[in-house]
Amino acid sequence: MTKTPTAPPLRGQLRRTDKIMTAAEVDEFLARAFCGRTATVGADGYPYVVPNLFTWLRSTIYLHTVLSEGHFIANVRHSDRVSFQVDEPGEIFAYGHVECDTSVSYRSVIMFGRITILDDEAQKTRFFESFMAKYAPAGSWGRERGSFPRMGSTIVYAIAPEIVTGKQGILPAVSDQWPIRNLTGSPGWKPKGSPSDP
């Protein structure tokens, strides 16, 4: 039986309220997540998504690109409205006797907000200090710290979130996984060819 489509939820509302991450969980996840994806929209109406290394400081996403003309900077100039997404896949597991009774543990954060270009050199320096502390912590390869001679050839962006949602699927205990426990989403299904096969 086909389900009748329902009206889409308002932006920022999650249908699965049982999977909502707390604000503290979202903050911790964004602080350590490795890579995010930024979605912009161009003057031609096409969306454009790029992966970015980033930092999360004082409830703001910071990222950078090289100082050159491309889709990303053109889209930012066209519209400051963006979406930013981070996810972390976990372990695939079975929870029932039907093949499609398969799921995965995960964490995912999506935000909608406004992006700006940072022109202040002190702000850009703080970004690069936090960026290098995250991706190349003190002691990495024994190099000089705090020198950013190519800062002038980069563009630093700040995304101020307006709406942030976090969603997670927690890996169940082994005792709650198939075949120890059958939590199938299709309780009436029987193996094909069995006498009760519909």
Give the location of each predicted region.
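C-terminal edge-of-domain segments
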Residues: 1-15, 116-198
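Short, basic/aromatic recognition patches
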Residues: 9-37
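Anion-coordinating catalytic cores for phosphoryl-, nucleotidyl-, and glycosidic chemistry
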Residues: 18-19, 27-28, 61, 73-74, ...
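Short beta-strand segments
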Residues: 33-68, 84, 95
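Short, surface-exposed beta-strand-loop junctions and turns on beta-sheet-rich folds
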Residues: 55, 69-71, 172-174
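Structural motif
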Residues: 60, 81, 114, 163-165
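Short, structured beta-strand-loop surface elements
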Residues: 68-127
